[in-house]
Amino acid sequence: ILNVLYNNVLQINPNNFSSTDRNRYVHSKGHTVEALYTVLCDQNFFSKKDLNSLNKFNSHFIGHPTRKVPGIEHNTGALGHGLSVAVGMAIGFKLDNKPYKVYTLLGDGELSEGSIWESLLSASKYNLDNLVIIIDRNGLQITGKTEEVNPIEPLLDKFQSFGLCVKQVNGNSVSELDEVFKEIPFENN
């Protein structure tokens, strides 16, 4: 998912990262930040040598996203807050009449957090067609399987009930991801 986003979709790189005129990416699924570090390294935000300090004392490369790492948009880690930040960014773009999009990756385990559902209410109210929410539906969270800990199905129906356009693809398929991202903005049927 991250490779497709950074290589084919976001158009974010070290040369334009400090610009306000660009798309945004919020990594809400903070515990998978190592995957994001790898992609950011491949995009030349920092060197592979920098990654040698991962999770070491005084390192900026810790177990959750921090803005101290080049290419990280927002600190995340507390479950469910990334979507709230992404919604706020998307509203800001709308208010400023900016054409940019905000993409955010959520883990299905964090869908148990109330702030997710509050954010969806706002996304629906403000018709945020510039917000792309990606859910990694792997069925797991820290204490077990999502459907055993706190069931979230029928997930598609829940998101559609907010008036959101929902697409389901295989997140391991580059071609499916490429295709669905090319369809943005989606037509809400």
What is the predicted function of each stretch?
Residues 2-125:
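Cofactor-binding active-site loop characterized by glycine-rich and histidine/acidic residues
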Residues 56-68, 89-91, 95-100, 120-189:
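Thiamine diphosphate
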